[in-house]
């Protein structure tokens, strides 16, 4: 069980994927999902457990899936997609015994994901087919998909690619990711009316045709050490432009991910680590 209603104790597992860290809760015993206030409290690094996102293990929603999971950002808002979280949920289900075999399916709020166990603590997750049409992102004010968009933001023009990986992403290509204005430009794009659902903003540096460096300013969280869907989005935008090959290493501040996109109508596959940190109880 995840929670003990009489004592108010909440059992959890702390995990991370390339430094993107999570509190994992098993809600399959009927424990209700956290509301926004509780999610923010759990995620608080000073007064709670501390994490980028809360992941809730739930009953499967699609036929043949091992389980489903919910996603809550550190500000308490709900999310629809989290690539690093998908790998951690997969590893949690394997340790729990729920997921059997080398391949299985898990349901995110956005879609069903095929998962494959790799060597050690690594998992591969099929993240879906990138969607570039503005209505699917959503991106307002543009009728058709483009390789690059431009928006006036506080007296400057920001150029970016845009894609949905089940959640909205803007990708800004930069010469040096270490010097990128991640927080300033990330926050400005998130607040721009062109993104009615806000947006995750990635800053990508092409090192060579098979290597990208990336930092991501996530909606509802801020900059994180890694963002799996952001790595997929950056790779897809750069691949579509012909800037990189269809199989790349993406280096984030917290670690390395491998992103493969075999063809335009095929799913992006993300590979990377899923690490257990500790199990605990939170007294609420």
Curated annotation (Swiss-Prot):
Reactions listed under catalytic activity: (2S,6S)-2,6-diaminopimelate = meso-2,6-diaminopimelate
Self-association or partners: how does it assemble? Homodimer.
Q: Does the record carry Cytoplasm as a key word? A: yes
The reply to whether rRNA-binding figures as a keyword in the UniProt entry is no
- Which EC numbers characterise this protein's activity in its record? 5.1.1.7
Q: Which domain of life is it from?
A: Bacteria
Q: Where is the active site?
A: 82, 227
- GO terms, biological process: lysine biosynthetic process via diaminopimelate
Q: Which SUPFAM superfamilies match?
A: Diaminopimelate epimerase-like (SSF54506)
Q: In which pathway does it act?
A: Amino-acid biosynthesis; L-lysine biosynthesis via DAP pathway; DL-2,6-diaminopimelate from LL-2,6-diaminopimelate: step 1/1
| Function noted in UniProt | Catalyzes the stereoinversion of LL-2,6-diaminopimelate (L,L-DAP) to meso-diaminopimelate (meso-DAP), a precursor of L-lysine and an essential component of the bacterial peptidoglycan.
Task: State one molecular function term (GO).
Answer: diaminopimelate epimerase activity
**What Pfam families does the annotation carry?**
DAP_epimerase (PF01678)
Its family?
Belongs to the diaminopimelate epimerase family.
Q: Note the site residues: Important for dimerization.
A: 278
| Compartments reported by the entry | Cytoplasm
The UniProt keywords, alphabetically, are: Amino-acid biosynthesis, Cytoplasm, Isomerase, Lysine biosynthesis
- Matches recorded under PANTHER family: DIAMINOPIMELATE EPIMERASE, DIAMINOPIMELATE EPIMERASE, CHLOROPLASTIC
Protein name per its UniProtKB record: Diaminopimelate epimerase
Cellular component GO terms held in the UniProt record = cytosol
Q: Where does substrate bind?
A: 20, 53, 73, 83-84, 167, 200, 218-219, 228-229
Read off the InterPro entries from this record: DAP_epimerase_AS, DAP_epimerase_DapF
Question: Where is the site described as Could be important to modulate the pK values of the two catalytic cysteine residues found in this chain?
Answer: 169, 218
